[in-house]
Amino acid sequence: KVQSARNNCKDVFHAFLVTNATYAGNLEIPELSMENAIPHKLIPFSKIFRSSSYDSWIHFYEDDVVFERLWNNPKRYLPILQRFQGVISPDFSLYRDMPLVMQQWNTYRSRAIAHWLQTNQVPVIPNIRFGDERSYDFCSVGIPKHGTISIGSHGCIKNKIERVFFQRGLEYVVNELMPQNIVVYGSAPSSIFGKYQENGIRIIQFNSDYSVTHSKVVSA
């Protein structure tokens, strides 16, 4: 029996998000369309409700609890998202100590929302999130090659151990997707990103909202 054949069935799986989607890989992750746009301004999801900075791209580099409501009720927020320049797909967490199935589920959720936004004429830059090598097989599935991708480095490279995992994951993603542009939310030191720039990849770096706020407090 399939869900679509059940009368008066509440769509608890949010199947409407992937209507007419094509899927990639054994996990059937929704595929996204190519996006080559380059954002010039970012705004966190939590601030879009009182903002008129519609020339910004919305990002989700925040605690999951802040934007879980988008997954719970995406139709409610669509008109607001459509006002802005575009969206970087949701950054649902992939912690290394999370069960792998939860990491896969969060990757699916991000892609499903991204696909749905694209079908509603919202430009979407895919966010790539990985944990350790277990997540490599699916972290970039469904993402077109040679486009623009986004990566969050905030909180991932300060600690030596975390930095190693980040570098390994980034290298895998770049080799797999061969992007033209990488949007980096957080610091983008040349020790990590320099070799990609030398190979012709454009790095577009944005300071994290935390670092911007902290620098203002320190300088005040």
Regions found by a protein language model. Give the residues of each.
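Eukaryote-skewed repeat-based solenoidal scaffolds used as protein-protein interaction platforms
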Residues: 49-50, 70-215
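C-terminal accessory extensions appended to soluble enzyme cores
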Residues: 1-32, 198-220
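Non-catalytic, usually N-terminal nucleic-acid engagement modules in DNA/RNA processing proteins
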Residues: 9-78, 98, 176, 193-194
